[in-house]
Curated annotation (Swiss-Prot):
Methionine sulfoxide PTM positions: M109, M193, M240, M242
Gene (name only): Apoa1
Entry function: Participates in the reverse transport of cholesterol from tissues to the liver for excretion by promoting cholesterol efflux from tissues and by acting as a cofactor for the lecithin cholesterol acyltransferase (LCAT). As part of the SPAP complex, activates spermatozoa motility.
Subcellular locations according to the entry: Secreted
Family: Belongs to the apolipoprotein A1/A4/E family.
PTM comment, free text: Glycosylated.
Domain of life according to the entry: Eukaryota
The name this protein goes by in its record: Apolipoprotein A-I
Length: 264
């Protein structure tokens, strides 16, 4: 029963046709990927559930109860498919329209990011160039000292370390200067990007189209509930005979077992 409830819930949430991922020629949106995954999962649940029902009916207890679960399971699957067909077009059309209406926001944000990237790139290139130059200069200064270290005796190690220390400090100071310079150069662009992003979010929040979609979403959910109610009622009616039969048969088995124990 848990598998049945999960299957119905997933169908209600996705409301899509059984479109498989490998049948798509064009790139899929995130919503399409979620719907495809849900459909594959629902199909797997239905198939595995039918296998369990078939195995139970084949068992000695299932044959004794004679519940006709497999037939009822197929009826349940048909009812679920009908529910999916009723809800699919309405839900798919709503989300597709919402994605189209908000596409301009993504385009504007990508445009802003590209503009900032073009402005910042020269500073990054200059920083990388200076970094490489200083690393090469440091390597040239250290190389002779390293050779001298190999040739000198242990007693000159401290003297050599003293000579290396100023070079390392000079390199560190130069790197700090470059980093501070880069931070100063990038600061206006970072602030500009934050302001641009805040502006885009404000535009998105105040956009009348999205406000309209908020209202339409409420209407859509209400309509969806009204359309789903008959299908769910049919599903409930399909399950009730099976549950009542199961309850009666199980009670009969319990009564017989009680009579047997009493007789002993």
């Amino acid at each position: 029963m848990k598998a049945v409830v999960l299957a119905v819930a997933l169908v209600f949430l996705t409301g899509s046709q059984a479109w498989h991922v490998w049948q798509q020629d064009e790139p899929q949106s995130q919503w399409d990927k979620v719907k495809d995954f849900a459909n594959v999962y629902v199909d797997a649940v239905k198939d595995s559930g039918r296998d369990y029902v078939s195995q139970f009916e084949s068992s000695s207890l299932g044959q004794q109860l004679n519940l006709n679960l497999l037939e009822n399971w197929d009826t349940l699957g048909s009812t679920v498919s009908q529910l999916q067909e009723r809800l699919g077009p309405l839900t798919r059309d709503f989300w597709d329209n919402l994605e189209k209406e908000t596409d301009w926001v993504r385009q504007e944000m990508n445009k802003d990011l590209e503009e900032v990237k073009q402005k910042v790139q020269p500073y990054l290139d200059e920083f990388q160039k200076k970094w490489k130059e200083d690393v090469e200069l440091y390597r040239q200064k250290v190389a002779p000292l390293g050779a001298e270290l190999q040739e000198s005796a242990r007693q000159k190690l401290q003297e050599l370390q003293g000579r290396l220390s100023p070079v390392a400090e000079e390199f560190r100071d130069r790197m700090r200067t470059h980093v501070d310079s880069l931070r100063t150069q990038l600061a206006p662009h970072s602030e500009q990007m934050r302001e641009s992003l805040a502006q885009r979010l404000a535009e998105l929040k105040s956009n009348p189209t999205l406000n309209e979609y908020h209202t339409r979403a409420k209407t859509h959910l209400k309509t969806l509930g009204e359309k789903a109610r008959p299908a769910l009622e049919d599903l409930r009616h399909s399950l009730m005979p099976m549950l009542e039969t199961l309850k009666t048969q199980v009670q009969s088995v319990i009564d017989k077992a009680s009579e047997t124990l009493t007789a002993q």
